């Protein structure tokens, strides 16, 4: 043994050939701070080893290295610029040490080789993988960019254009793709991987492969003419500006880093990369996006815990109510390996549900994500039925009939009589209280809400609603089933609108009040999309949700929270509803809609909306951008905080993920609680007080007032990790 540490070891495997194997005692290999320090010492031991002729990098896991340890990021990023720069210099010196070994080096890859793992293998002379290899640099998705030499080495290995595409898109390349662009030198069968790597390394040792020329190319300036350079970087900047936009600076910074470093040799180019990395690492966007990643891991951890605690795994499911929603739920369940009975009282609805499932499967087939055999198997695992026969075999029932309390109660009571005593029954409802629906059941402890979002196959969130009688076992089984479906389940307590709709409608309330006071809805949409970062402004979102749906939900919310959400008079939603302007579904709402060549609705402004709004709005008044953002966001933020204060949602992490996954809250802002930390709670309280005369929706919750007085934040404890 040449060197041994907890997460890696080095031994001589053949005459003069050493193998450095990453072998963490945990389930995956990560380049955490401790592993980097061990790698540094291992390379020192290799340099001192007599008779070294070549080095192989391997992993004892199915994935080579999944990346750096992201849980350490926020702690690192909280350091001063100088401390972070110093640490990056140390990290880069390790990879330089690997790259500068006086012998040829090869990385032997399988599974994920991502982020820091990819940057590590770029420092070796050659890379060989099997067909499971997935290699890339996803850092820009976290608001940062490669900081261990990825912006320097990748362009010199695969060319500037391909490197900018991989880095700016945060892409992981499949083995065949990586081979095509030169990121891998060879792809072989898994059982031949080790021997092929040894053979390749031996060829390099025997000078049949010019490893020194490869190394020289990686440590020299990029070979681009002035014209090539200008064309490459100008085009890349244009594409990135169009795709990433102003709220996500990391992709553009990566392009600038590659451009600035192109004319320098490795060490000077690394200095440039370091400078830009530090700037990104200190940004609010990086803090938010890394925070979201950590929150996502937290939610996945909770789901795993629930699955372990559940006494029974869901092997079969049933959906009551077909159509688009029922078909979408059935498709998602079947796709993830849980056969499903889809029951409806009408054959046309069953046909629609099966058509929806077939359409979604055909899309996957046309994109090469499944083959015909797999598609047929998935479709066959959805059983459409007009009867309850066979439903007794289901472990979980998802009721997805029309949003009407009487109809739902009748269906729930009926299905309960057809299933076993330990069958879990859920209701896919967006507004009807779970405690109300539970009254129709003999076993309310086996019942909870399971709120899917439309379109089911695309929306990652499922809101799991706990009623006052719901048992922990029921929650655990439903959370485990949602996770099995590939969804992110968030458990909330029952209240009008649950969490998502409860916090959305004060936002719509702020919108209605702005219109009442003379604001232009097209300007509000523009500001909330371009400046704040929502995917859709409130008027457009209402059109997509459906004005009739929003009108109904608004009445439910007003009844549930009369003090904050009760209305003094008619508003814009009432006016559009009364004029039968329901939005996209009938071609006319705040905007008018036509169907484009791809069959998608295209919105345009039409003056016919103006007389409809005239009697609920005062004369036109211009509001500045900041006022619009504040008047729109304060009611939502207050309601989110009240939900935490009242225990409707358990943690800031779960609330923020729900907002991002369920409502499209701008990821670069990280959710309401991350946003409050970023703005400063005391600053938010002072700002909100300026609008207190607008009514109860603008009154700051006591929790925020108390936290502001104590100088507290919601995510203070997440700033961990040390250099």
From Swiss-Prot:
Enoyl-CoA hydratase/isomerase: annotated segments: 1-189
Residues under site feature: Important for catalytic activity: 119, 139
Gene Ontology annotations of biological process type: fatty acid beta-oxidation
This enzyme's EC code(s): 4.2.1.17, 5.1.2.3, 5.3.3.8, 1.1.1.35
Residues annotated as binding substrate: 296, 501, 661
Annotated keywords: Fatty acid metabolism, Isomerase, Lipid degradation, Lipid metabolism, Lyase, Multifunctional enzyme, NAD, Oxidoreductase
One GO cellular component term noted in the UniProt record for this chain: fatty acid beta-oxidation multienzyme complex
Catalytic residues in the record: 451
Disulfide bond entries: none
Region (3-hydroxyacyl-CoA dehydrogenase) residue spans: 311-723
Pathway: Lipid metabolism; fatty acid beta-oxidation
Binding site residues for NAD(+): 325, 344, 401-403, 408, 430, 454
Reaction catalyzed: a (3S)-3-hydroxyacyl-CoA + NAD(+) = a 3-oxoacyl-CoA + NADH + H(+); a (3S)-3-hydroxyacyl-CoA = a (2E)-enoyl-CoA + H2O; a 4-saturated-(3S)-3-hydroxyacyl-CoA = a (3E)-enoyl-CoA + H2O; (3S)-3-hydroxybutanoyl-CoA = (3R)-3-hydroxybutanoyl-CoA
Molecular function as annotated in GO: 3-hydroxybutyryl-CoA epimerase activity; delta(3)-delta(2)-enoyl-CoA isomerase activity; enoyl-CoA hydratase activity; long-chain-3-hydroxyacyl-CoA dehydrogenase activity; NAD+ binding
Function noted in UniProt: Involved in the aerobic and anaerobic degradation of long-chain fatty acids via beta-oxidation cycle. Catalyzes the formation of 3-oxoacyl-CoA from enoyl-CoA via L-3-hydroxyacyl-CoA. It can also use D-3-hydroxyacyl-CoA and cis-3-enoyl-CoA as substrate.
Protein family (similarity comment): In the N-terminal section; belongs to the enoyl-CoA hydratase/isomerase family.
Subunit structure, interactors included: Heterotetramer of two alpha chains (FadB) and two beta chains (FadA).
Protein name, per record: Fatty acid oxidation complex subunit alpha
Organism from which the protein derives: Vibrio campbellii (strain ATCC BAA-1116)
